[in-house]
Amino acid sequence: MKTEQTNLSSKVCLVTGANSGIGKSTAHALAMMNATVVMVCRDRRRAEPVRDEIKSATGNQNVELMICDLSSQADIRRFAAEFISSHSRLDVLINNAGVVVRQRSLTEDGIETTFAVNHLGYFLLTNLLLDLLKQSAPSRIVNVSSAAHAYGKIDFDDLQGEKKYGGFSAYANSKLANVLFTYELARRLDGTGVAVNCLHPGTIATGLFRNLPKPIEALIKLVTFSPDKGAETSVYLASSPAVEGVTGQYFAKKRERQTSSASRNEESARRLWEVSEQMTGLPG
């Protein structure tokens, strides 16, 4: 991946889902810029070789691995407390981890898995790290969404797909939630020096869609490109001086783009925020 030669040697960057796909490429690119990179992954056995690979390839020894299961709210809380106790600053938070779940399933918290990981995981982790991000301002939050958000719908009577569930629709709904969350968070962070943006990485050749029906999976493979290419917009939003102070926007191919009309509904964004607070036990 071609990266701008920004020096991030004084910056701490956290990337979730950093052991494969876009997350791995993002972590690698930020390590090339001399950032302290904290890889947040679920499986230590799979992630340790990736951390070592990034260290070796970049010569940057400040690449750390921390373990967190983003489907578990208790584990997110444990991880956030551990991170805050071991790091005095956080300059960039990249919410990248995501899942596609073909058959409806529930987390240990009793929440539909796609919504739990792809939306509530972003929401809870970000809120728990917000004070540290504010203390480190100017800082940045980057939420990896998708153009699939345009196919999503936020049905407050069926947020968890109890009445009707499909793997792609659940994914699209969660990506719409990412955009609504980004816009609402940007409004709430106005004046704090913390910028928050979201992005469409492109359709990436990763394992994310392996749980979709075979015909759809085959079609997606025809239009995908590499994780390195897909990570470019995440890295751009995390590091580029060109977007200093830019907040509350959606990007694709490193350019601002307009999102769906549903994603720009401020009442939906506020309501989703309130419901998310209730579902994660955060104070309103």
Predicted regions and their residues:
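Rossmann-fold NAD(P)H-dependent dehydrogenase/reductase core
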Residues: 1-205, 282-283
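A short, mixed-charge helix-start or loop-turn motif at secondary-structure junctions
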Residues: 16, 163, 167, 216-220, ...
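Short, flexible, mixed-charge acidic loops at enzyme active sites
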Residues: 154-159, 211-213, 251
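C-terminal helical subdomain
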Residues: 174, 198, 218-258, 264-270, ...
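Hydrophobic alpha-helix feature that most strongly marks membrane-spanning transmembrane helices
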Residues: 190, 213, 239-242
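A glycine/serine/threonine-rich, flexible loop-to-helix segment
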Residues: 204-219
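Intracellular terminal tails of multi-pass secondary transporters
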Residues: 270-284
